[in-house]
């Protein structure tokens, strides 16, 4: 049985799980178990399919009798799609295991319907990766968007519905851009098959138009700036295992689409240099502003969603380098850029999935998203705390975890730009490196804040004081992802050549030197990555701080004493503990132009019960783009909708007239 046949069985299981959930409406507990177990098995088969295809190393193509003449049903599984299937299936397995007990919280609240939409969501993502026809690609892309939209609005409260509407608008705006790009290529090729697109040699102007349409269309799904506004609202609104899939793998469909169009469908046309520079620029801006806005958040899931914008930016940085390499016919830049992009795509799926599952575990016990109402959870939820600690270290690119490895390769790709003689790239490379360095520092600060405020210190609410560990299936799911974060880092010298082979096969570039003890990336001294030295670095860096800590502890043990914290003469209260607002305050001053601070008087906040005064604190920090651009657009759209609402008269005859008028306009347009 080949990889495509295995993948077909995986899709059948997802569809069976979705239909079974639909027929079990009202029997939520049974639907949760059936949906979770079936999708788990489907994910395992998907993993086997991806590994089988990567091991075989050949492109598989299957054609079926089309239901429409213009839309051939063709499946094509190459190295990139197999890699994406593997990444998605890994996270599906873990999230399915997690859902078996997590979804009990939604019993009686539409859990069976959520199982239906969840499995449709997974199936559409996986099928989209191997679809080789523009019509069916768009159909599956829309299925993915609509099913995830239903998951976003699952709670049916005002916040989730507002988030869902913004997501719906931006997702479909992106779909329209992608559709126009495919129609332009279809007009030139006379077919909607991707195979015909690959043979096109478009004019520079038309090729650039197609690329920009596809880039911003798929970029809206990826959550890159400036099309990111839906992401920090929609992802936190969904159930946590759905958030893990949306943030961990759904946004990567956007990255996949950008790679597919720019480096596959338009490869015959050729890539202008400015395409890669544009992708690098937007990636750098997304990375820096994404982590900066994450730092300002008090909502734990919104913080993680903003961090996804940051990591999408890092991936786009590496993708931009790869596109520059293709433009300059430089296989080193191309392969190293894709190595960094694909490695970080995999790693981000794992540690972001882990952190969203950890956030879901916390929220299920404390019933709040506000980190200021958490604290001291490491004592009460030790397994969750341990798993989240690994996730925070990984996402902060701290060795010896996987986030460090992929960001290291991204750095290598940027260093490799120094070999290029183009002045624009000699300027773009250092600027991107500075922005990536600042991003890395802010990311460490962000997740120190998240972990410290959430798991350390004193409990800041009754729910935090009474919190208990989550059930074993949720713990096992989180620990599996934590173990993968460590395992992938330690196997980097084995895994990197495999990913480089995927990059080579996808772009048809000459393979770089890959061997044990030999530089993974051939080039000058400062661009070389040696597996043995990298492994030594991974083992040594975490060991040195540990030795220093033991030395300091032995020296100070004799002089240490324990007592109450000094509170300036007042009795200690948990509200006096350091807060996320305090951590962020210096950055609010430095980057004040990028934030709009909202304050609200709260009479319930009193540091001392004997003081009946009103204290003020920042309730939210609104990003500049959302406040100055997105909010006015939304308001204008709402006003326009009210103005044209009279067209919805309820008169069926008038609606028929609208249809006839639209048909006449279309016929005139075609005739002209």
UniProtKB/Swiss-Prot annotation:
UniProt keyword Membrane, yes or no: yes
Membrane topology value: Multi-pass membrane protein
GO cellular component: formate dehydrogenase complex; membrane; plasma membrane
Induction info: Most efficiently induced by formate during post-exponential growth at low external pH (pH 6.5) in the absence of respiratory electron acceptors O(2+), NO(3-) or trimethylamine-N-oxide, i.e. under anaerobic control. Transcription is activated by FhlA and HyfR, inhibited by HycA, part of the sigma-54 (rpoN) regulon. Second member of a 10 gene operon (hyfABCDEFGHIJ); it is not clear if the 2 following genes (hydR-focB) are also in the operon.
Membrane side Cytoplasmic: residue ranges: 27-30, 101-119, 186-199, 264-272, 333-342, 406-427, 496-504, 553-651
Top-level lineage group: Bacteria
Membrane-crossing segments per the record: 6-26, 31-51, 80-100, 120-140, 165-185, 200-220, 243-263, 273-293, 312-332, 343-363, 385-405, 428-448, 475-495, 505-525, 532-552, 652-672
Periplasmic side: 1-5, 52-79, 141-164, 221-242, 294-311, 364-384, 449-474, 526-531
Single GO biological process annotation from the record: formate oxidation
Keywords recorded for this protein, A-Z: Cell inner membrane, Cell membrane, Membrane, Oxidoreductase, Transmembrane, Transmembrane helix
Knockout-associated phenotype: Deletion of most of the operon (hyfBCDEFGHIJR) has no visible effect under fermentative growth conditions at pH 6.5 or 7.5, during aerobic or anaerobic glucose-limited growth at pH 6.5, or when combined with hyc mutations.
Keyword Membrane part of the UniProt annotation: yes
InterPro entries, A to Z: ComplexI-like_HydComp, NADH_UbQ_OxRdtase, ND/Mrp_TM
Family under the similarity heading: Belongs to the complex I subunit 5 family.
Function text: Possible component of hydrogenase 4.
UniProt cross-references to NCBIfam families, sorted A to Z: PRK06521.1 (NF005086)
PANTHER family: FORMATE HYDROGENLYASE SUBUNIT 3-RELATED (PTHR42682:SF3), HYDROGENASE-4 COMPONENT F (PTHR42682)
Name used for this protein in its record: Hydrogenase-4 component B
Gene name in the database record: hyfB
